[in-house]
């Protein structure tokens, strides 16, 4: 059987909030089977829990933010969620003492390291997958995103930026998902932004924590970071990383093909909502034999049932 997963023990880190520029403490705790991913604002009294589900995503400008009915928010969840999805973690409680997840280095890699440092524990319940049985598509002008039936999880993603540095890079990528492919090829890709936008955002009290330490920064012609890019195609890879995180608010790993052109957080969430609403287009499945599982996650060392 393919089992559900959580972290073996609590793990804690600190970082900077992208928009506030303030110090943020993040704690990831194990959770029982069928908990899903829950986020908790511990800086509020009493603490406020926000479930990581698609209809709680109520802000998608520059990041993915969960917002409850009282307006309590947790922003910039997508890189952490990409790491959780990439390592196949089904159940966890995420505590944060600020309105945003720390940006770390602008990629998912620090979260992958954090999760791997404490280990992943298999639990005594079957892992659930969302298997796509009919195509679901959403569009916004020339942008579109689609989920289609596929035995596995494949991503076919294209971006189109009219910028000389990005245009020189590969702007289209197809990959068959596995934990190892995610960690090696996707997880280190950083968010990117343009100097002109950063100046405007800072003037409006946003992106106060943004820097070349946690983003690829471009002017009109080139990358400004002294160390350059981590991957030649880092731009499209980061958009894929974002999509992994955005799709994980569906609640389970997806068995299907995700195809997208020029999508961002808003359209990714729109696609998840459209999928969940179209209940004849998917089904929940589990797999008795590992050989039958179409999506490959890294095997935790010395897995112990919880």
UniProtKB/Swiss-Prot annotation:
<feature type="binding site">
    <location>
        <position position="242"/>
    </location>
    <ligand>
        <name>Zn(2+)</name>
    </ligand>
</feature>
<dbReference type="GO" id="GO:0009245">
    <property type="term" value="P:lipid A biosynthetic process"/>
</dbReference>
<protein>
    <recommendedName>
        <fullName>UDP-3-O-acyl-N-acetylglucosamine deacetylase</fullName>
        <ecNumber>3.5.1.108</ecNumber>
    </recommendedName>
</protein>
<comment type="similarity">
    <text>Belongs to the LpxC family.</text>
</comment>
<feature type="active site" description="Proton donor">
    <location>
        <position position="265"/>
    </location>
</feature>
<keyword id="KW-0378">Hydrolase</keyword>
<comment type="pathway">
    <text>Glycolipid biosynthesis; lipid IV(A) biosynthesis; lipid IV(A) from (3R)-3-hydroxytetradecanoyl-[acyl-carrier-protein] and UDP-N-acetyl-alpha-D-glucosamine: step 2/6.</text>
</comment>
<keyword id="KW-0441">Lipid A biosynthesis</keyword>
<feature type="binding site">
    <location>
        <position position="79"/>
    </location>
    <ligand>
        <name>Zn(2+)</name>
    </ligand>
</feature>
<dbReference type="InterPro" id="IPR004463">
    <property type="entry name" value="UDP-acyl_GlcNac_deAcase"/>
</dbReference>
<dbReference type="InterPro" id="IPR011334">
    <property type="entry name" value="UDP-acyl_GlcNac_deAcase_C"/>
</dbReference>
<keyword id="KW-0444">Lipid biosynthesis</keyword>
<dbReference type="Pfam" id="PF03331">
    <property type="entry name" value="LpxC"/>
</dbReference>
<dbReference type="InterPro" id="IPR015870">
    <property type="entry name" value="UDP-acyl_N-AcGlcN_deAcase_N"/>
</dbReference>
<dbReference type="GO" id="GO:0103117">
    <property type="term" value="F:UDP-3-O-acyl-N-acetylglucosamine deacetylase activity"/>
</dbReference>
<dbReference type="GO" id="GO:0016020">
    <property type="term" value="C:membrane"/>
</dbReference>
<comment type="function">
    <text>Catalyzes the hydrolysis of UDP-3-O-myristoyl-N-acetylglucosamine to form UDP-3-O-myristoylglucosamine and acetate, the committed step in lipid A biosynthesis.</text>
</comment>
<dbReference type="InterPro" id="IPR020568">
    <property type="entry name" value="Ribosomal_Su5_D2-typ_SF"/>
</dbReference>
<keyword id="KW-0443">Lipid metabolism</keyword>
<keyword id="KW-0479">Metal-binding</keyword>
<dbReference type="GO" id="GO:0046872">
    <property type="term" value="F:metal ion binding"/>
</dbReference>
<keyword id="KW-0862">Zinc</keyword>
<feature type="binding site">
    <location>
        <position position="238"/>
    </location>
    <ligand>
        <name>Zn(2+)</name>
    </ligand>
</feature>
